[in-house]
Amino acid sequence: MARTLTALGESFPLATPFRISRGVKTAADVVTVTLSEGGVIGRGECVPYPRYGESVESSIIEIEAIREALESGIDRRVLIDMLPAGAARNAVDCALWDLELRLSGSDIATAMGLA
C-alpha cells in the first residue's frame, strides 16, 4: 500500500518565556512528521536544538532526503542507518512506531512487553 510523508515546521509561542543561563526561549519550534498508509496515520515530532547544530529547516531537509525510502515502506530498523541520531531521526522514528502499531492494532505497552 502507498505511504505518504508530510514534514512541517511549526512554532508555538510560550505563555511565559523560558529563561536559563544561556538564553531565553519564547516559542517552541517543532517539526511534525506524519506518515499515512491505507487511511492510517502515524505521527512524530521533534524540537531541533541549535546547540547541536539543528534547526527546523535542517531537520526537514534531513527528513526530505529520505522521503523516497519512507514512502516506499522502510521500517524503523532501517531508519537507524539512514539518518544520524538527532531531532530528525527522532521525529521519523516516532511516526514509524505510531504507524506500525496503529496498522497492527496494537499499542506501545504491548509492543514493549509491558502489558
PLM regions: where:
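N-terminal capping/lid subdomain adjacent to the active-site entrance of alpha/beta enzymes
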Residues: 1-115
